[in-house]
């Protein structure tokens, strides 16, 4: 509460459509960006209930900051916590927990939103199996233009069958073919969040960056989204609690 009261300026964040880096760094130092991560990885080991209560507090002061934290932690980093192999978690999780790096979750497309099974982005395996080539677009990706690593859903061929299945990939912005089409889509509210449109143009992704089992990306997506939607509700509850006394006073 003290940090939020001292450092969060929701009017400035909304006006400038940006959350200052010093706020993000401060949240990282407090442990807010890795609340449910295991202690051995630098997290706090909080329960979902405790995490939700903190998001309520942040949401009561600045919705943009609450949504930023939720996107980074609840759906971005959460994918690693649930489905990452040890090499992946050891490589990235400590930086995410501390806020040195940021995470995003790239599912939504022009033709796929709540209908997660309708993802059209394609991932074609190389002949030698060393990498996949991703081609497609994503939109409305919270933290999409500021994330250091994104969990991207794409369709991969099912071996021995003439069909595809969704697979999750870990993607970094420095990969050739990664393009930010629109870094901050204009919105009426939560303007401080970096809601982006992205494009993957023949982008090679190493095979070791597959997250979870091959062809099981839909399970990854739905499992992570279940957690994120619950904690998003906590953000909204905090905002509603803050609005009630203001409405009564008015």
Where are these regions (language model features)?
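A short core secondary-structure module
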Residues: 130-131, 135-180
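Short acidic, glycine/serine/threonine-rich loops at helix termini
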Residues: 47-49, 80-81, 115-119, 144-147, ...
């Amino acid at each position: 509460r003290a940090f939020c009261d001292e450092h969060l300026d929701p009017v400035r964040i909304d006006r400038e459509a940006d959350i200052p880096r010093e706020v993000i760094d401060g949240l990282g130092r407090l442990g807010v960006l890795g609340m449910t991560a295991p202690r051995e990885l630098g997290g706090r080991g909080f329960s979902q209930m405790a995490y939700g209560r903190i998001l309520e507090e942040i949401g009561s002061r600045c919705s943009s900051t609450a949504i930023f934290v939720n996107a980074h932690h609840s759906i971005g980093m959460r994918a690693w916590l649930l489905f990452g192999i040890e090499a992946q978690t050891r490589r990235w999780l400590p930086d995410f927990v501390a806020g040195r790096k940021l995470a995003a979750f790239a599912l939504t497309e022009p033709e796929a939103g709540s209908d997660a099974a309708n993802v059209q982005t394609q991932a074609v395996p190389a002949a030698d199996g060393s990498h996949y080539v991703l081609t497609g677009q994503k939109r409305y990706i919270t933290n999409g233009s500021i994330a250091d690593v994104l969990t991207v859903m794409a369709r991969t061929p099912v071996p021995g069958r003439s069909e595809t299945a969704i697979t999750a990939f870990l993607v970094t912005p420095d990969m050739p073919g990664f393009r930010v089409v629109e870094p901050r889509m204009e919105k009426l509210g939560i303007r401080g969040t970096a809601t982006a449109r992205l494009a993957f143009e023949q982008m090679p992704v190493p095979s070791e960056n597959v997250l979870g089992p091959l062809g099981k990306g839909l399970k990854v997506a739905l499992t992570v989204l279940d957690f994120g939607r619950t904690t998003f509700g906590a953000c909204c509850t905090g905002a509603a609690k803050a609005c009630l006394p203001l409405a009564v006073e008015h």
